[in-house]
Amino acid sequence: ACLMVRKSVYDEVNGLDESFAVAFNDVDFCVRVREAGYTNVFTPFAQLYHYESKSRGLDENPVKRKRFISEVERFQKRWAKQLAAGDPCMNPNFDLMKEDFSFDIKPLE
């Protein structure tokens, strides 16, 4: 993740939560920034390369997988209300549990 924020805002929300050792520390931070009344802004004009998991490796071994699942559960519990309300920037037709923008196909009633 690449984040830019004023130091005063970073300090106000107590920075990144180290209990999210690998996953969700950036997302948790952005939700806390928004909850504090600030706006998160995305720019398509910045360009950078991020090689996901390049330095730490993938979450394939049992210990890393367990840590990841724990962080998912903790994030979902902490932000249950906000997650239930939905992401205002996310297309409601996409499956929120997948990273590939798959459609969330619901059976017809």
Residue ranges and their predicted role:
Residues 1-14, 19-49:
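A short, conserved alpha-helix in the catalytic core of glycosyltransferases
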Residues 4, 40, 57-109:
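C-terminal, non-catalytic tails of nucleotide-sugar-dependent glycosyltransferases
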Residues 51-54:
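Conserved active-site-proximal loop/helix segments of enzymes involved in bacterial cell-wall
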